[in-house]
Amino acid sequence: MPTTMTKRAVLGCLAALMALVLALSGCGTNFGTTDDGKQRYRWKMTVTTGSTSTWYLAAEKFAADLEKETDGRITLKVFVSERLSAGEATAGVEQLMDGAKDFSYNSPIIYAGVDPRFGTVTAPFIFDSVEDGQEALAGEGGQVYADYLSERGVHLLGFGESGMRQLTNTHRPIHTPEDLHGLKFRIPGFGLYTDLYRTLGANPTTMPFGEVFTALQQGAIDGQENPIDVIYSSNLQEVQPYLTLWNYSYDPLVLGMNEKLFDSLGQEDQDLVGRLAADANEFQIQKNREGETKLIEELEAAGMEVNELSDAEKDEFREALKPIYSEYRKVWGDDMSRAFIPEGL
């Protein structure tokens, strides 16, 4: 019996030690210094999407460039599908804020699960194109984001781009708000989207994105919304016959770094991280825009029926959502509203 108890105690200690190691392994772990006295780092980064997405490709480019330019002094391991937070994207950004991991690519929608002000840029029908969205982020909007992220312990390394969010469903093409009535859509855990879909007569529900394919396959939900890259890389064409291109919400990507980690770096490493992050963002945006038309064609070839809303149809949705803009200005605050919400909405 004493021997058995000792083994159990040892196993318990080992389990606790492993948990501690895993918890600390994302915190900008350093591994001594080089011969010339520079600090070595082993960092971790997550993306919400899978390994065929432009998010992942850009993150891998960032990792490869860091390792190459530092001769292996800095390495970065990229994890797909929010693996470090068991698929929970909001928990993932909280890890970044708390320093349990080092970098992430996340949508502002996910940050809005922590602070709803971050969702302002994704408000419905405020941008006509991805170029309009990027222009807003290059100006006052980007600085407001940087300030608010800093308050939450995240250093902004710029923006990538997931694109305009589109709609898929099982039952019919969507042309008017009435076409949404009674349909159950999976949405991110984001109050704005919940109110938006209810206002349009749909039945919104939230769940981790990793569960969406199975829920669609089993008929537990009727549809979902996401950018084309995410729809394609998640193989939703296998379980969704209808795709509506309505460009209702612009979805940039926040490339964030734990701020304490960034502040702990020397100026040379800070400059290096900033420069290579900018390169990764530019690469991701280019790949995303270049690939979208081709991906839509491939979705059609796979059997999806695709319809695109006219300007008049978009105006009908915009008119139906006017109460949302009025209500959410109080949530977004003056800084975010001024930076992103057009006058008259």
What are these regions (language model features)?
Residues 1-42:
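Short, low-complexity disordered leader/linker segments with a strong preference
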Residues 28-127, 151, 156-345:
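N-terminal secretory/targeting leader peptides
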Residues 128-148:
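A gly/proline- and charged-residue-enriched helix-loop-helix capping module
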